[in-house]
């Protein structure tokens, strides 16, 4: 017997859709207004820099022959499906966990779109201190990291606290 979607964690998928919209809109804006590798300083430690990443986080496997595009696409699809199954099995009241899953799904789908359409992930957020630059990233990466941190945080919450949170207390 199936459950009504609104009673499951899938109710929170609107957050994944929001992440995808904001992510793809920001990337489109950067691609429209910047040349590849163009950098515009905004404040002393933050630039907008249009970059393409053919690998994963920190350009992992970026120097390979192209197979990594499909590998990372498969991972994004697999993780998104797995998290949607977990959301379906959870209740809508499990807000923290479902929001975390939705953030990860939205980020994964935003970067998946880039891989399939552009052949690489579009990055543009560039933090730096003097000549040391943190790897350039995007809104999708940020959503994935926040979602993963929330999953870890949720793991530290006691069952009694989870029950209270889910009741809205």
Swiss-Prot record:
Query: What is one GO biological process annotated to this record?
Result: proteolysis
> In the record, what terms sit under GO molecular function?
aspartic-type endopeptidase activity
Under catalytic activity, the entry for this protein gives: Release of signal peptides from bacterial membrane prolipoproteins. Hydrolyzes -Xaa-Yaa-Zaa-|-(S,diacylglyceryl)Cys-, in which Xaa is hydrophobic (preferably Leu), and Yaa (Ala or Ser) and Zaa (Gly or Ala) have small, neutral side chains
Organism superkingdom = Bacteria
**Transmembrane spans:** 4-24, 42-62, 70-90, 102-122, 137-157
Listed pathway(s): Protein modification; lipoprotein biosynthesis (signal peptide cleavage)
- A Pfam family (short name) is Peptidase_A8
Q: Keyword Transmembrane helix on this protein?
A: yes
Subcellular location as annotated: Cell inner membrane
Which EC numbers characterise this protein's activity in its record?
3.4.23.36
Question: Keyword Hydrolase: yes or no?
Answer: yes
Which residues are catalytic? 123, 141
Q: What general EC class does the enzyme of this chain belong to? A: hydrolase
User: Where would you say this protein principally sits, based on its record?
Assistant: membrane
Q: Which GO terms describe its cellular component?
A: plasma membrane
Q: Which InterPro entries match?
A: Peptidase_A8
Q: How does it sit in the membrane?
A: Multi-pass membrane protein
Record key words, sorted: Aspartyl protease, Cell inner membrane, Cell membrane, Hydrolase, Membrane, Protease, Transmembrane, Transmembrane helix
Q: Which NCBIfam families match?
A: lspA
> What PANTHER family does the database record attribute to this sequence?
LIPOPROTEIN SIGNAL PEPTIDASE (PTHR33695:SF1)
Q: What family is this protein classified in?
A: Belongs to the peptidase A8 family.
Q: What is this protein called?
A: Lipoprotein signal peptidase
Can you name the source organism?
Yersinia enterocolitica serotype O:8 / biotype 1B (strain NCTC 13174 / 8081)
What gene does this protein come from? lspA
């Amino acid at each position: 017997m199936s459950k009504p979607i609104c009673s499951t964690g899938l109710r929170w998928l609107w957050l994944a859709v929001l992440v995808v919209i904001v992510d793809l809109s920001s990337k489109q804006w950067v691609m429209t207004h910047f040349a590849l590798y163009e950098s515009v300083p905004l404040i002393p430690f933050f630039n907008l820099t249009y970059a393409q990443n053919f690998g994963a986080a920190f350009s992992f496997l970026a120097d390979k022959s192209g197979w990594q595009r499909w590998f990372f696409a498969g991972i994004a699809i697999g993780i998104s499906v797995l998290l949607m199954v977990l959301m379906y099995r959870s209740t809508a009241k499990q807000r923290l966990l479902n929001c975390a899953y939705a953030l990860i799904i939205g980020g994964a789908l935003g970067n998946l779109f880039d891989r399939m359409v552009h052949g690489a992930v579009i990055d543009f957020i560039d933090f730096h201190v003097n000549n040391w630059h943190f790897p350039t990233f995007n809104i999708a990466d940020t959503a994935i990291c926040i979602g993963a941190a929330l999953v870890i945080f949720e793991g530290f919450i006691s069952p009694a606290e989870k029950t209270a949170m889910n009741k809205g207390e």
